[in-house]
Amino acid sequence: MLFRSELQNGYQKYFEENKERICDTNYTDETFETEKIALVSNPIHTGPKEPVVWYQLGELMKNAKERVKIHTPYIICNDMMYNTWKEIAERVPDFSIMTNSVANNGNPFGSADYARNRNRILNTGIDIWEYEGGYSYHGKSILIDDDLSVIGSFNMDMRSTYLDTELMLVIRSKEINKQLEEGMMEYERVSRQVLEDGTYRDPYHVEPIELTKKRQRNVLLVQHLLGWARYLF
């Protein structure tokens, strides 16, 4: 109780001394009701980990009825991860992922691995959208149907799956799902859909980032020299 009293007094003192800096905002008016919130985490020990977050996200996505939409900066998968996506694609009518294009990706390892494995990703049945916004996209979120939202630090890569201690917040709320979708669509309007023949569907008339010769050389160099260590990136 003493600590709480000290905290309240400290806040009141700060408020009186900084009135002009404090905005007049009632944050309660800007919140949404939720049915449930859960935090999903990988184990916290150092070294290799059981892919807890991947398993749990996979089960959530497999149980979707209509759609799953993923945003991730990087895609670096192994067989187990590709198989999870195949299962989701077989069950869910609308299954898509947005990631950086090869030219737009700020991570040379992620860019090189994606360039090499793009067709394999497509073969899982997932629709790929490539972001061309001019700066490397770094959002990590998932929409499941119209009521489930997942936001956090997890990339769709092996490092997040097996090495890092990642967190994802799972929220059941139609209002938050709608708000998150609006934010995600702002980026998708600067993206193009990759088709199976290597061409693009471009409903938003996006100007793609140029894949320079220097960038192409760097991609090839990383593929040849560091492909063996792809799970680290």
Predicted segments with their positions:
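Charged, low-complexity intrinsically disordered terminal segments
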Residues: 1-233
